[in-house]
Structure formats: C-alpha cells, structure tokens
Amino acid sequence: MKKTVCELFAGVGGFRCGLNNIRTAEDYGKKEKWDTVWFSQWEPAEKSTQYAHDCYVYRFGTRLDNNGEDTTNYNIEDVDKTTLPDFNLLVGGFPCQDYSVASSLATSKGLEGKKGILWWSIRETLEAKKPPFVLLENVDRLLKSPAKQRGRDFGVILACFRDEGYTVEWRVINAAEYGYQQRRRRTFIFAYKNNTKYAERILNTIGYTDTLEEEHTKECMENAVLKEGFFAETFPVNKAESAKMKIKELPVEVGEVSETFQCAFENSGIMKDGTIYTMKTVPNYHGKQITLGDVMETG
C-alpha cells in the first residue's frame, strides 16, 4: 500500500510532522515516508490573515487538486471532495471550539456549533474518497458532548463511520501520562475499512467472529483495547479497577442518533458494525518522564 495521506484542518502541519518524524528545522526538505497529496487549512478571516496556511506552504509547499487548482486555502465546505487526489490515510484535528475548555460544557453546542458542523466535511471526504484508514484528533470532551444529551456527538460520528463501512477505535490520551512534558488530554480516533487486510488481521488475532456469544465478544473486544488494537502497543493501558466492558447499540439512522442517543462513553473503546464496546482504562507506562526543565533553553 502506498503511504499517501490527506491532511484536513492542517494548521501548520502537526500530523505531517508526526507521520514523517520531523523534529527540527533541519528535517524539513528531507524525503518524507508519507506523501501528503493534499491538505486543507483555512480560517474564516481575510486572505491576509491566513498565517497557519502561509506557514505550512513556506515549510512544505502546496498541493493541487485533480483539476490542477490550488484549493488548499479554501473553505473546506466549498471544496468538491471528488476532485481530491486519491490517498490511503485521512488525518486531521477537526475544529473543536464548541467542545473545548474555552467554553463551559453546559453551553457547548457540539456538532450544532458553527465550527462543529465541519465534521460533515470529513464525512463528505469519506464518502467521496473512501480512504482505508483515518486518524483524527479532538478534545477529550467530545465523548461527553453536549451536556443535555451526553455522548450524542460522538455517537453521530460513530454512526457516520459505520455507514461508510468502518470499524473505529478511540482512546483518550494524556501526553504527560506517557512521559512527555505537557498535560494535554485528547481523544484520538482511528478508523479502518472493514474490507482491509488490517481489519482481517485484527479480527483473527482477537478471535472474533459474528457468531460469538455476547460474553465471548466482550472478551475479544477487551483484548483489542488492551493488547492488540491500534493504540495498545504505543500507549499501553490496563483495565481500570472494577471496570467492565459496556455494550450499546447505535440506532440505525444518524438522525435518530442525533435526536435520542445517549451513551456514557469511557476513555477507550471500539465500534464495530454499529455495536459500541467501551471500558475505562488507566495508563501502563513506566518509562522516562520528561519535564519542562529538560526542554527549556537556559542562559
């Protein structure tokens, strides 16, 4: 599989730097393992204030769509997703103003908010390009938004992935709990098409079939969360004390999810074929702890 990626809501290129292990200014310009075939970065302001896009282009250059046009600094809602080059991985830290600590949970509008609706641009991209893999990032509050209907917004996201034929893993990760010098809790979402070899390997590894009894299915999904899933090796966890795997079904229609669905999502979980498996986990990290003093310049 070619390592081709599309980066939405790109900022100054955080996902691109991570995928290609770009750590210093000297790393820019080196051959990248992942070929970024297209990206999008746009702020709803005057053209002269597109600082993040300007920085991205300064470091990495721009990309053209299949019509030979540069639409990387257009409102993503106005971009025809069918014109994007093909890619195998879609990444993005989609706008999260409505979920973040910048506003209280009680007043959060979630997917109904001005920027929250940009989730639908991600869904349009999934429909148009059908990438086999997706990696997204948002604030941890996403799992509980909005206050009046806890879990609705994340339920809508999962239902959209289900309808496009994806299995989804998620994990709330705090960088400080894995040795880094910043307390930063974020929800990471990894989705993969059900017809990929990766999906087949995961199911075979955890021993899952669609004919298993519920208790055996829960054991398989717990194995995926704790040992065999996408996040398990890099960000190891243990089951929290007295934690149990909870199961909940998504309504068939996305509209019904939006109107009635509620779920007490835990910090780890999997959704497969519309069934949600979620459990509370705790970090299992015993390595070096980097402090702020280790990275600050002195003198």
Which residues does each predicted region cover?
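Core alpha/beta nucleotide-donor-binding catalytic domains of modification enzymes
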Residues: 1-133, 139-155, 159-162
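S-adenosyl-L-methionine-dependent DNA methyltransferase catalytic core
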Residues: 1-36, 160, 186-299
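Short, conserved secondary-structure transition motifs
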Residues: 42-44, 176-181
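Conserved hydrophobic/aromatic beta-strand scaffold that supports enzyme active sites
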Residues: 91, 170-172, 188-190
